[in-house]
Amino acid sequence: MGDMKTPDFDDLLAAFDIPDPTSLDAKEAIQTPSEENESPLKPPGICMDESVSLSHSGSAPDVPAVSVIVKNTSRQESFEAEKDHITPSLLHNGFRGSDLPPDPHNCGKFDSTFMNGDSARSFPGKLEPPKSEPLPTFNQFSPISSPEPEDPIKDNGFGIKPKHSDSYFPPPLGCGAVGGPVLEALAKFPVPELHMFDHFCKKEPKPEPLPLGSQQEHEQSGQNTVEPHKDPDATRFFGEALEFNSHPSNSIGESKGLARELGTCSSVPPRQRLKPAHSKLSSCVAALVALQAKRVASVTKEDQPGHTKDLSGPTKESSKGSPKMPKSPKSPRSPLEATRKSIKPSDSPRSICSDSSSKGSPSVAASSPPAIPKVRIKTIKTSSGEIKRTVTRILPDPDDPSKSPVGSPLGSAIAEAPSEMPGDEVPVEEHFPEAGTNSGSPQGARKGDESMTKASDSSSPSCSSGPRVPKGAAPGSQTGKKQQSTALQASTLAPANLLPKAVHLANLNLVPHSVAASVTAKSSVQRRSQPQLTQMSVPLVHQVKKAAPLIVEVFNKVLHSSNPVPLYAPNLSPPADSRIHVPASGYCCLECGDAFALEKSLSQHYGRRSVHIEVLCTLCSKTLLFFNKCSLLRHARDHKSKGLVMQCSQLLVKPISADQMFVSAPVNSTAPAAPAPSSSPKHGLTSGSASPPPPALPLYPDPVRLIRYSIKCLECHKQMRDYMVLAAHFQRTTEETEGLTCQVCQMLLPNQCSFCAHQRIHAHKSPYCCPECGVLCRSAYFQTHVKENCLHYARKVGYRCIHCGVVHLTLALLKSHIQERHCQVFHKCAFCPMAFKTASSTADHSATQHPTQPHRPSQLIYKCSCEMVFNKKRHIQQHFYQNVSKTQVGVFKCPECPLLFVQKPELMQHVKSTHGVPRNVDELSSLQSSADTSSSRPGSRVPTEPPATSVAARSSSLPSGRWGRPEAHRRVEARPRLRNTGWTCQECQEWVPDRESYVSHMKKSHGRTLKRYPCRQCEQSFHTPNSLRKHIRNNHDTVKKFYTCGYCTEDSPSFPRPSLLESHISLMHGIRNPDLSQTSKVKPPGGHSPQVNHLKRPVSGVGDAPGTSNGATVSSTKRHKSLFQCAKCSFATDSGLEFQSHIPQHQVDSSTAQCLLCGLCYTSASSLSRHLFIVHKVRDQEEEEEEEAAAAEMAVEVAEPEEGSGEEVPMETRENGLEECAGEPLSADPEARRLLGPAPEDDGGHNDHSQPQASQDQDSHTLSPQV
């Protein structure tokens, strides 16, 4: 019989998942001969090669692999010629075994207890200790993975590289390793199929050296493997002797021996530590390419009856073979299968391994999972030194469809498949590791690949030295494997420098073309050759990221989810009388396959609202809003048709409410597939309608004699159809905006014709053509039409954010917006390229990753949303301003409120509906007359607009505010309108429309830097409007108002604000809501009010002016029309008797004290006295009587009678405000005085000349009651 390639030890490690042998009992694997047909355990003969291959399960738990049949040339002659060369034994994986004596019957000297299956733990004492010299490395083999998704860990990698083989029937003294060149007989004979039992005692005399690190690790691993256990080489030959006499009675010994052999691999490190990472992919991919390119007919077991053993079950629990294949009675069964079944649960995916050709498996478990397709690889080394492989897939039986797996786990095998032959490297398609390993890819595999993903997630015991690779970890994400990941990425991944956060739509050719072509070729080959196998699905979206965020998963779910409803098929046969022409296939949606009979229906299909998807398209440089995935894919298809690759970032996917799903908005059939967000004053995003918006016409019809309509453009001399077309001609927007910005007022004009008409406004030249509607106006009315009717100065320059489309009025606002919303600040480590969001995270990173480095502060770096990174803030600011001219857009600001509009018709509609327009021509004439007559104050620096006057002056002349609004609104709006009247530079007499332009003009033209709020009347400027108002009030407001109290009889203090006057009246006079309409007075500049300087108690005398009440001068402001006014009900009268008869009705109780001067009531006499003294300046009666007596005595002694006063000189003090009536003395009776009441003002006119000088205690002219 022929011989078979010896499997490399680390290749065998990659195929199986072996638990820690210290936790296993060897007796657990024992099966009696009577149970071998019912139990899934199969007690085959002991094969140490297969036992050793169990040791690498922990190295790649997620790497599915397939054990293969290696066809090699017969080596019987060479091995028979070399069987006398016995050297110190080496394990065929490069590990040193014990140096046994060259006794040809050495294997017969083993302990009989071990031969009978007892525990072999006592056997190492009989062997020589292992040697510690450096070992040659055998790393030529790599696992070959099958392109099927449900291949968890399988036996693989036999025969990828040519190595020396031994004869299947070794001589009795076959304890030593036999060497010899391999190339002598590689191509001599067509080799029949062999199985794993042909692999014995092989040594490669010329191994390829490993790198130093890997060699040392290899050597250390080999020593650690052999030292604590018995010599595996001797055990292997002992197993060989048992194999020739394989009987059912040896099953106990086999199981025990195998369990003992498991201890040999407990400390074997994973394959990743033994092999360089850069050689892991090429061999596997070469096998896949050969498998796809050359489909060689499978050689069945019946064609080669002598060689039907091909590892019938060391891997997939002996369940991958076909139950219909006959069992070979001579086939010894693998001990790995029995051990695998004894230590692995049947439902553990990692215990499922597939043999390469298990059609002739001796037994099949009834509950075994579906079979994995097998691969047969023929390896031939040519004379030139190249290695050629022929890969043939052995398909499962067609009568068992459950054995056809779905998907492909190629990525796991490719990511772990090493190869050291540079000639065998094949470029690896990027989508394989993305789909198979799920290395940070958000999409993973589709629903068909769920079984593979679940199998990778399952956990099982592993070797103690084999670290697990977590699911979803990117290559190189584990600590300690940086070199491997770097080599893997450098040698295998496609050179696609994709943005981090960028999502690429692969189904629209958004991955590199070579990758997409490879995927297409592979899919087509599999469809032609293997229709029964489910093809690997290419993911639609690639997320180049270490970990997929939740929003990306939702985004992928939206894009990848299948249609919940069947495809819509319309009725393409309309009635004949409908005269509807329908295409043969209707109007079909290229994204989902739905077809429609009408084009409008297709447009409504693209405009349906199902989900809120907001992405930033890097090609369009703006944020797009989609409400269904068809519109998103259609937008990507538009880019694909131009040869571009759509990349989108800043994902925002969220559901929409049911009330927002159905919006009654007409959908234009020519609207783009990606409707922008709805237009708003703040964002300024257009709806993207294909038809131009209608022109904005004037707010109201102009007076006929003031304007003249023309249908010819005076700028380009183009004849128009009507005035609407002329207005649209002046308002059309051109794509080229260079040279359309006015240098005087910085206004951005829509086109050249409008720009020329606008320039003549500043030059004051005719013809006076409106830049908005194109009409001709007379010079006197031109500014009125331009400002009030067409709102030309509502045009402003806005700056649109290229990232989100938000429009700002200034560059400073745009810069702050970008820095806050679209700029990310990171703290970069000073020793490595890692960057973190916070400084504390960077410090923790430095402490853990760079503990020996001196402490250095982290560096701030700035990342723009376009993925550019800057290490200085000024660089990113320069990056913001590099394309400022491209961000300028024209917006329209309402002159009455701060709202912004993108379209001029929207502004006009807003003004009409919110602020109103003139109702008739009379108002227009009044507007015109006010414009002609109003002018600014001389000597002030108030900027005026030429040739018409300010809007505020014209609006103030209107009878009811701006075109029909109430007077109250007119007063409120008068002040804001003053700020919008424009500015005139006093140095160059240039007029600018707004404050910002005035500040910019002063800085550019005259080199003066003004603050944000300059004063119109002087050269000062301020930062806040409050400071400006205070400055104007204190320095420029020469005409001031003061407010006096009309209820105070004497000279009362003035109040600068009405609120202070209201407080005074409420507190002093008890009136809550006084009428202040007649209380204000204008204070002359630099002067004082006469009442302010009056004495508080003026002395009555001859100099008193006639015609005043009680001989005192009473101002009309102080005294209203009525002398007596009731404080309770505002009753007023000039008659004192009438007033005294009125106030008792407000007296609730007779015991209540009531003021006879104002009618207010008090609970006690003391309160009334205090009120009389404070408000009416009337003292108590006793004090008044004493003062009157003292004054009378003084008058008798000193005073002389005046002008015929007679002999009797009564002392008329008028302290109570009651004048003498017809020369009668004042009655002393209080009741009589109360009933008498105050005399009219006319009665006091005759006795003014006889009134003596008042005493110093007289306080008021009002009537004082007797208490």
UniProtKB/Swiss-Prot annotation:
GO terms for cellular component: nucleus. GO terms for molecular function: DNA binding; DNA-binding transcription factor activity; insulin receptor substrate binding; PH domain binding; zinc ion binding. It is found in: Nucleus. The modification Phosphoserine is found at residues 78, 142, 145-146, 529, 573, 689, 691, 1089, 1205, 1250. The keyword NAD does not apply. Transmembrane segments: none annotated. SUPFAM superfamilies: beta-beta-alpha zinc fingers. This is Zinc finger protein 592. It comes from Homo sapiens (Human). The lineage of its organism: Eukaryota, Metazoa, Chordata, Craniata, Vertebrata.
